[in-house]
């Protein structure tokens, strides 16, 4: 539920490496 400061409209979350996932075109962590 914490925004990772990254969008995932066109590309996947690079921050997925630290546990972030794409939700509603924005990368979130928990």
Curated annotation (Swiss-Prot):
The keyword Disulfide bond applies. InterPro entries: Cyclotide (IPR005535), Cyclotide_bracelet_CS (IPR012323), Cyclotide_sf (IPR036146). There is a cross-link at residues 1-30 (Cyclopeptide (Gly-Asn)). The keyword Disulfide bond applies. Keywords: Disulfide bond, Knottin, Plant defense. Expressed in leaves, petals, petioles, and runners but not in roots (at protein level). GO terms for biological process: defense response. This is a cyclic peptide. SUPFAM superfamilies: Cyclotides. Disulfide bonds join 4-20, 8-22, 13-27. It holds the Pfam family Cyclotide. Probably participates in a plant defense mechanism. The presence of a 'disulfide through disulfide knot' structurally defines this protein as a knottin. Belongs to the cyclotide family. Bracelet subfamily. This is Cycloviolacin-O17.
